[in-house]
Structures are given as structure tokens and as C-alpha cells.
């Protein structure tokens, strides 16, 4: 499984970090379903790419990789300090089962969440719920939910 973590980092992080501007790349932790490392890179004022390399600890232990394209609405929840965008998007999830008894699952993600980005620091905290439509090896519905934080640099 250590090789899967390395593969996830090799696939997801380096190509994205080349697009990052100052304070546009965030790296942190996601806790829930799944639990692991989370990243986000802003791709303009209201859009971002986000993802995780994590463990899915639900019904079966599995290594989880996902990447999402996100749209942000900064006006829905106005705050006096910092920023609190609502976000939604579309992404992909790969689920590699540890026991080898089940096939690798590939699904489409529909993330919904909010992230508070502090005005005085480079920290963002988020909560999200994500309906997932697995397409391979068979069609199935799943639901992920998590909280997390990222440091932006």
C-alpha cells in the first residue's frame, strides 16, 4: 500500500503545483470518509482543482484517490473577516481495495462544501459531502463526507 500512496502523490501533486501562484496551492488533511492528505490549487478567482490521496475506511479498507474541478460562490455566505465560499463541482474517484477480493472502483464525484479561509493566515478549513456514482466494475451509489484543513503557500 505504500506504493499506492507514492503513486497517488506522483500522479496528483507535481503537475498541479507547476500552475500554483503565491498562496494558491494548499496542502493539508482530510478526515472522515476518506481520511488522508488533501490538496487544492486555485485556477483563477472562483475555480479550483482539489483532490486527495487517502484511506477509505468504510465498509472495506481501500486506498482512495480523487480529483475534482470546483466552482466557488463567495457571495452565498458573507463574512466580515476572511472568506467563506460555498463550492460544488465534478470529479473522479479511484478506489483500490486492500484485500484484493473486490475490483478497483471508478466513479464520478459531485462534491458540495464550504471552506472558511482565514484573512490573517494561510489556513483554510472545510467540510464537504460528496455523492458518488460508481461506474466500474458496476454501477453503484456511494456517499462520502469529511472535514479538513489546508495550509496555503
Predicted regions and their residues:
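Cleavable N-terminal export/targeting peptides
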Residues: 1-23
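Short loop/turn motifs that connect adjacent beta-strands in outer-membrane beta-barrel proteins
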Residues: 19-24, 45-46, 74-84, 102, ...
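Transmembrane beta-strand segments that form the barrel wall of outer-membrane beta-barrel proteins
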Residues: 21-33, 43, 47-57, 88-96, ...
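Residues that define the transmembrane beta-barrel architecture of outer-membrane proteins
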Residues: 23-25, 31-35, 61-65, 84, ...
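Residues on the lipid-exposed face of transmembrane beta-strands in outer-membrane beta-barrel proteins
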Residues: 29, 37-41, 67-73, 90-94, ...
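Gram-negative outer-membrane beta-barrel proteins
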Residues: 35-37, 57-61, 75-77, 96-100, ...
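Predominantly the C-terminal beta-signal and adjacent terminal strand-loop region
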Residues: 60-62, 119-153
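Mid-chain, well-packed structural core segment of small domains
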Residues: 79-119
Amino acid at each position: 500500500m505504500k506504493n499506492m500512496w507514492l503513486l497517488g502523490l506522483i500522479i496528483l501533486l507535481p503537475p498541479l503545483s507547476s500552475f500554483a501562484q503565491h498562496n494558491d496551492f494548499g496542502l493539508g488533511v482530510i478526515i472522515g470518509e476518506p481520511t488522508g492528505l488533501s490538496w487544492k490549487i486555485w485556477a483563477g478567482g472562483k475555480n479550483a482543482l482539489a483532490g486527495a490521496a487517502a484511506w477509505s475506511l468504510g465498509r472495506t479498507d481501500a486506498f482512495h484517490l480523487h480529483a475534482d474541478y470546483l466552482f466557488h460562490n463567495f457571495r452565498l455566505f458573507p463574512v466580515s473577516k476572511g472568506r467563506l465560499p460555498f463550492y460544488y463541482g465534478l470529479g473522479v474517484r479511484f478506489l483500490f481495495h486492500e484485500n484484493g477480493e473486490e475490483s478497483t472502483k471508478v466513479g464520478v464525484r459531485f462534491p458540495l462544501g464550504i471552506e472558511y479561509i482565514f484573512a490573517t493566515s494561510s489556513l483554510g478549513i472545510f467540510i464537504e459531502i460528496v455523492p458518488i456514482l460508481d461506474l466500474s466494475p458496476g454501477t453503484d451509489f456511494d456517499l462520502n463526507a469529511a472535514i479538513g484543513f489546508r495550509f496555503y503557500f
